[in-house]
């Protein structure tokens, strides 16, 4: 190794504590900024190039660097995303935070070869701008450049598998294996694209559902987890809950109503309109049940599940579900229990004389 390379190694040794601290701090800061941007990433990894690795690099091309600050990959950070679309979003965050050395940054996605799936990473060479952070005692913090690689989980897995198999190592491998690896690369790229496409379509579907719910076109909205969550945001059971609470001037305690979704599906409701029709047609019956159940008590706190449960009770009784139907309802809402059978029998017996059962 020549004298110049040895001097660069000496500079590396003196800066190693700074490299190590930056490699720890920057990823943690990035995670915070990703959270603020609403970006969910799979992982943020980091490493500091070892002296042995740097020595090997200098042995090959030490004359390329006039100072240690010309070496841009001593600190390496890798941001692994779940979706292709998020790679560019991560890049946007980096562009806001750091000075990007565009001359040395590389978008390997634009150099697309038939077998290059795992190597489609976006690589930015970054530096901390003085306007964001500076320390007169450590001016090197604003001189050190570091590399940030951005890729998806599948691209990362592919790159690691290639490394393990020796593929891309410069050693010729039999064409049959090369062909199979290329086929796998294509399959993984399709999977990556499909994940992103499905996410975009789901986002579009959710926006459409929210618009339909807000406009009141509930009969056009299929009943599923997404649509039910949107439906609950308009608080469809509040009016009946307030009516029931007025029986005892009770306070309403909000509880999670998501467990009613499988019950509504078991009742063969297929759209949000089916739930809305139940509210319209059975609110009076549900109130009669509530008057009977709590009218003679001193309950002053009622769960917000009171209205939907009484609606389901009235619906099941009026449609001939009887004791079996009510037990299934209670099992779905509260979990299977022998006490549910007794409660179902009690509800059937006590409800038979209520006005709605005789109309």
Where are these regions (language model features)?
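An acidic, glycine-/histidine-flanked metal-binding catalytic module
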Residues: 2-12, 16-18, 22, 142-286, ...
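Sparse, context-dependent recognition of short Cys/His-centered cofactor- or disulfide-binding micro-motifs
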Residues: 11, 15, 19, 29, ...
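Short, charged low-complexity intrinsically disordered segments located at boundaries
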Residues: 55-64, 120-128, 216-228
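Short acidic, glycine/proline-enriched loop segments that cap or flank alpha-helices
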Residues: 66-67, 134-136, 252-255, 299
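Long beta-strand-rich cores associated with HINT superfamily self-processing modules
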Residues: 68, 80-197
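Amphipathic, soluble alpha/beta structural segments
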Residues: 113-137, 176-209, 288-334
